[in-house]
Structure formats: structure tokens, C-alpha cells
Design a protein with these regions (language model features):
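C-terminal accessory domains and tails appended to enzymatic cores
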Residues: 146-148, 167-271
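Short glycine-rich anion-binding loops that position phosphate/pyrophosphate groups of nucleotides
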Residues: 9, 37, 70-71, 95-98, ...
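Phosphate/ribose-phosphate-bearing ligand recognition and processing surfaces
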Residues: 118-166
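Hydrophobic/aromatic beta-strand patches that form the interior of the parallel beta-sheet core
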Residues: 30-32, 65, 91, 122-126, ...
Length: 271
């Protein structure tokens, strides 16, 4: 079995190493990912522009490739250029953050998996939901850091890929969207459907009360504060049962959502 692993957080992000470690006993692994963070970039593809490919090493010393492009670019380059044989499966992630609901169309992680499907390869998009109460910690000097605990994510991903290896990918779907909580009550994944949305979004400017907390970000060169706005977001807190959000956030268990790339709505017969 040959597996291509990519992500949108960048080739040196800890999640991509976790994904590799989860399945390296099951298949031959090739890692191809963007050279830097490309979160929320969706399915952008770089057409007719040069992309630089660099061979590099992950933290465990294993070989990987970085691409100066988007997550979808990395998948295309990996499948069509770097791999000798077409992979049997593409895994994208593990994303450092949640990817649920119909908002997944903006996710570089999920859209890289969608790109794999367009190339005729089944895929799994994997994300870690980090509970702010347990994932954000302080060191002995009082400095804050993020504790990326991929333990359960690696176990669930391993078991899922093992099932696919033994039984094949389900014929009726194109890809899986897997989200795993860092703070969990159950290790067993649940088959779910997409929630309507993940984020409540709001535009703020220098006149908003939230500006002191949310508007303090570095300016681009020669950029001034005047006429600047920022899109802020907060995680939706209420979800219907059997959705990915309810399973992940309320029930605190892994959510596995089967997806199809065909967005055709079959309900409309005549209009």
C-alpha cells in the first residue's frame, strides 16, 4: 500500500509527523506538503507559475518534500511528479485545529483531500480539536504553549487505515473527514453528518470595542491603520445531534464524516 501525506499547516508542522507515525507500519509513505502555513486557503491551485520543490527532513529524520504552493498544489505535485506509482490513499493533516461543518470548503486540509479525489484517489482529512481548557499550558517561566496531544488521533487514524487496507475504501463515498478531540470521553469514532456551520464571523475595525483584543496584529510594509478591517470568528456552540460538531464538542468523541465531491442537489425536480 502506498500513501501520500500532505497538510495545510506546512511540512514542518507537528501534525504531519503524527499522521506519518500513525500509518507508517501499514504502508509506504511519501510526505509532500507546503513549505509554510496555508490555513484556510481552500482549494487554490497555482497554474502556470513556477513551484520550488525542496527535499527536507522531518523531526524524526525521515525524508519529505516541501512545495512553494498550496496544499492542493502539494497533492498534485506528489501524485503526478514525485511518486513513482499512484498512491492508494491520500491523508491530509493532522490539522492543528477543528475542521467541521459546511465551512470545510475553506479548509486547506479538506480541500487537499478533495484534490486527491479529483485525481482518482480516495482520501482522509484529519484534524485535531484542541480543547482550550487542556491544550493551552504554561511552562515553568510562565510562557504559554500549545500541547499537541496526537495520541488518540494516531490510534483512530491507524485503525481506520487498517480497515481500509483490509476491506477497501467504501464505494459510495469519496473521502472521510475525521476530527478527533484532544480532551475526550470516548475513543470510538461515530459516523456523522456535517453541521450547517462552524464559525460565527464578524467584521471589526478600529472603532469596535473588541479592537484592543483582536486588532493588534502586525501591519504590512507601508500599511497604515486607517480604513483597515478584520474578520474575526468564534466557534459555534450549539449543534444538532448526529452532526460532527455535536459528536466532537458535546459528546467529546471522534467524528467521522463521509463526504462526496459531487455537490449536486438532487431534491429539485422542477422549478
Amino acid at each position: 500500500m502506498n500513501i501520500l501525506i500532505s497538510n495545510d499547516d506546512g511540512v514542518f508542522a507537528p501534525g504531519i509527523l503524527a499522521a506519518k507515525q500513525a500509518v507508517e507500519d501499514l504502508a509506504n509513505i511519501t510526505v509532500v506538503a507546503p513549505d509554510k502555513n496555508n490555513s484556510s486557503i481552500g482549494r487554490r491551485i497555482t497554474l502556470f507559475k513556477h513551484l520550488k520543490i525542496n527535499q527536507c527532513s522531518l523531526e524524526d529524520g525521515s525524508s519529505a518534500y516541501s512545495v512553494t504552493g498550496s496544499p492542493a498544489d502539494a497533492v498534485i505535485v506528489g501524485v503526478d511528479y514525485l511518486m513513482e506509482e499512484k498512491p492508494d490513499l491520500v491523508i491530509t493533516g493532522v490539522n492543528q485545529g477543528i475542521n467541521i461543518s459546511c465551512d470545510i470548503t475553506s479548509s486547506g486540509t479538506v480541500c487537499a483531500a478533495l484534490e486527491a479525489v479529483s485525481l482518482g484517489i480516495p482520501a482522509i482529512a484529519v484534524s485535531l480539536f484542541m480543547d482550550p481548557k487542556t491544550s493551552f499550558k504554561q511552562d515553568e517561566n510562565g510562557e504559554w504553549y500549545v500541547d499537541y496531544d496526537f495520541t488518540l488521533t494516531k490510534k483512530v487514524l491507524h485503525d481506520l487505515v487498517l480497515k481500509i487496507k483490509n476491506e477497501g475504501f467504501p464505494d459510495s463515498i469519496d473521502l472521510f473527514n475525521l476530527n478527533v478531540p484532544s480532551n475526550y470521553d470516548s475513543e470510538e469514532f461515530k459516523i456523522t453528518k456535517l453541521s450547517p456551520k462552524m464559525l460565527d464571523k464578524k467584521v471589526i475595525d478600529n472603532t469596535n470595542e473588541e479592537k484592543e483584543e483582536l486588532f493588534n496584529y502586525s501591519l504590512d510594509e507601508n500599511q497604515e491603520n486607517d480604513d483597515l478591517v478584520m474578520i474575526s470568528s468564534t466557534l459555534v456552540q450549539e449543534y444538532d445531534e448526529d452532526t460532527d460538531g455535536y459528536t466532537l464538542i458535546v459528546e467529546k468523541r471522534p467524528s467521522l464524516t463521509p463526504l462526496s465531491v459531487n455537490m449536486t442537489c438532487k431534491d429539485l425536480k422542477d422549478w
